[in-house]
Design a protein with these regions (language model features):
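Structural detector for helix-capping/boundary residues
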Residues: 33, 47-48, 60, 95, ...
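NUDIX/MutT-family hydrolases
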Residues: 81-83, 90-124
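Conserved Nudix-box catalytic region and its N-terminal flanking loop in Nudix hydrolases
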Residues: 12-51
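HhH-family (HhH-GPD) DNA N-glycosylase catalytic core used in base-excision repair
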Residues: 39, 46, 50, 54-60, ...
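Active-site-adjacent beta-strand/loop module that shapes the phosphate/pyrophosphate-binding cleft
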Residues: 8, 56-57, 65-89, 98
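Short histidine/acidic/glycine/proline-rich micro-motifs that form metal-
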Residues: 35-36, 68, 104-106
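Conserved N-terminal beta-strand and adjoining loop/helix that marks the start
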Residues: 1-13, 65
Length: 126
């Protein structure tokens, strides 16, 4: 799995809520998704951002990774800094979008796999 850490000039981060009816519905997360067979993480993240938000991104540097095991599966999540190069983020899959200041990140209900990154960003160290 891959996820984009997109930050605006005012310091706010882009997060999306998981749509109703999905696994972990309603939780806020960094946008992204699964790596398809034959894709690189970079290709997968660019595809997911277009499919989910209608934006083109430039994938920049890796930020961190997270491993989480739940009752359904093991998840290895790769987080990359990304910059929107075309389009305006639009919720194309029934999710909500929000731009959150670092201090607000810790107040959001998020999946366990995002917890360490949120702690880093909220502390200003990532």
């Amino acid at each position: 799995m891959v996820a984009a850490v997109v930050q605006r000039g005012d310091g706010r981060f882009l997060l999306a809520s998981r749509p109703e009816g999905s696994h972990l519905a309603g939780l806020w997360e960094f946008p992204g998704g699964a790596i398809e067979p034959g894709e690189t993480p970079d290709e997968a993240l660019r595809r997911e951002m277009m499919e989910e938000l209608g934006v083109e991104v430039q994938v920049e540097v890796p930020v961190t990774f997270a491993f989480h095991r739940d009752e359904e599966r093991d998840v290895l999540l790769l987080f990359y800094r990304a910059r929107i190069t075309a389009g305006v983020p639009t919720p194309l899959l029934g999710q909500q979008l929000g731009w959150f200041a670092p201090r607000e990140l810790g107040t959001l209900a998020t999946p366990p796999a995002d917890a360490e990154l949120i702690a880093l960003l909220a502390g200003g160290t990532a």
